[in-house]
């Protein structure tokens, strides 16, 4: 979905969704770059700014997107281990911050008292900036990512989602984060300096042999590479690194695979490609209202099939 921060900024007030909450792209979580969505939308005309703040109330206090009144927030475990729900004025998806006091992309942090009197910090996981968070809120049955898991993350971008995956797997787990873009890779490297369970790899995910010596066997492959040959890229990496019956979680953007076909047709084709690559699809979920024409497909890798 094309989004022009300047032009839509003014609309923030009237549409709420775009400027304020779906402004999770711009307001709620700083969108596709808080600076670009919130910043430019806000700076260009007071109405954009008001849209941010007001949508902010709907989406939670201001552009940062979090819960007001930390004392009243109750943290409950989500059915996916390592993921939590913060219940306050509204319910928010959160992960326990592996590096307390540090935010990665200006996300809201919530501090609560644990039973032993110490403070525990959680980070709000914005579904408008993370396909995995959108999938969890959409009701995925199994994400295979849990405390202690080893994850190969293809298409890590600047590390926004990767940082939350690192929180979920915790200090006993490991995230190998592969990103092709050097610009995004710089942000990824900076994030990994603090999160020591993230191993950043700035390389093309098609060229498995270039990082073969860095990656061990993993429990799950997550892919968000938005390339026409995405299924093949996942298959190459699964063959090299994924254990038998390991999990495969793929985020599919229909327009990146085939911009002329209907999204449902593209998704069905991708499922068929996965089956041909020894991946047994288990569930498929569209990501509305967070992303248009996106879906997540979850499967199990049957190495000896």
Swiss-Prot record:
InterPro entries tied to this protein: Fibrillarin, Fibrillarin_CS, SAM-dependent_MTases_sf
Positions bearing Phosphoserine: 111, 114
Family: Belongs to the methyltransferase superfamily. Fibrillarin family.
A molecular function (GO) term: protein-RNA adaptor activity
Keywords, sorted A to Z: Methyltransferase, Nucleus, Phosphoprotein, Ribonucleoprotein, RNA-binding, rRNA processing, S-adenosyl-L-methionine, Transferase
Enzyme class: transferase
Organism (species): Schizosaccharomyces pombe (strain 972 / ATCC 24843) (Fission yeast)
EC numbers, comma separated: 2.1.1.-
Name this polypeptide is given: rRNA 2'-O-methyltransferase fibrillarin
General function of this protein: S-adenosyl-L-methionine-dependent methyltransferase that has the ability to methylate both RNAs and proteins. Involved in pre-rRNA processing by catalyzing the site-specific 2'-hydroxyl methylation of ribose moieties in pre-ribosomal RNA. Site specificity is provided by a guide RNA that base pairs with the substrate. Methylation occurs at a characteristic distance from the sequence involved in base pairing with the guide RNA.
Entry keyword annotation includes DNA-binding: no
GO-annotated cellular components: box C/D methylation guide snoRNP complex; mitotic spindle; nucleolus; nucleus; small-subunit processome
Biological process (GO), any one: snoRNA guided rRNA 2'-O-methylation
Quaternary state and interactors: Component of box C/D small nucleolar ribonucleoprotein (snoRNP) particles.
A Pfam family assignment: Fibrillarin
Bias-annotated ranges (Gly residues): 7-69
Lineage top rank: taxon: Eukaryota
Main location: nucleus
PTM text: By homology to other fibrillarins, some or all of the N-terminal domain arginines are modified to asymmetric dimethylarginine (DMA).
Reactions that this protein is recorded to catalyse: L-glutaminyl-[histone H2A] + S-adenosyl-L-methionine = N(5)-methyl-L-glutaminyl-[histone H2A] + S-adenosyl-L-homocysteine + H(+)
PANTHER family given in the database record: FIBRILLARIN, RRNA 2-O-METHYLTRANSFERASE FIBRILLARIN
Location of the protein in the cell: Nucleus, Nucleolus
Binding locations of S-adenosyl-L-methionine: 160-161, 179-180, 204-205, 224-227
PROSITE patterns in the record: FIBRILLARIN
Residues covered by region (Disordered): 1-70
């Amino acid at each position: 979905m094309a989004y022009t921060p300047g032009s839509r900024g003014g609309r923030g007030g009237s549409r709420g969704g775009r400027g304020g909450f779906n402004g999770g792209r711009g307001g709620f979580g700083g969108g596709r770059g808080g600076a670009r969505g919130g910043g430019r939308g806000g700076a260009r005309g007071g109405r954009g700014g008001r849209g941010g703040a007001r949508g902010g109330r709907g989406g939670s206090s201001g552009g940062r997107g979090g819960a007001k009144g930390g004392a009243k927030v109750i943290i409950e475990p989500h059915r996916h281990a390592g993921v939590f729900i913060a219940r306050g004025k509204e319910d928010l998806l959160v992960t326990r911050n592996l590096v307390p006091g540090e935010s990665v992309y200006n996300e809201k942090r919530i501090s609560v008292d644990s039973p032993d009197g110490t403070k525990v910090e959680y980070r709000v996981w914005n579904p408008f900036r993370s396909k995995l968070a959108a999938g969890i809120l959409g009701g995925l049955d199994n994400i295979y990512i849990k405390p202690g898991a080893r994850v190969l993350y293809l298409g890590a971008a600047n590390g926004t989602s990767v940082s939350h995956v690192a929180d979920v797997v915790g200090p006993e787990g490991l995230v190998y984060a592969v990103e092709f873009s050097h610009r995004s890779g710089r942000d990824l490297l900076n994030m990994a300096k603090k999160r020591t369970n993230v191993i950043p790899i700035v390389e093309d995910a098609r060229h498995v042999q270039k990082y073969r010596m860095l990656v061990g066997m993993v429990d799950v492959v997550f892919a968000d590479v938005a390339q026409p040959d995405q299924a093949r890229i996942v298959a190459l990496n699964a063959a090299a690194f994924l254990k038998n019956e390991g999990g495969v979680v793929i985020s599919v953007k229909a327009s990146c695979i085939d911009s002329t076909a209907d999204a449902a047709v593209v998704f069905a084709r991708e499922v068929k490609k996965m089956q041909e690559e020894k991946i047994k699809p288990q569930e498929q979920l569209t990501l509305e209202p967070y992303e248009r024409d996106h879906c997540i497909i979850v499967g199990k890798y049957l190495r000896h099939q």
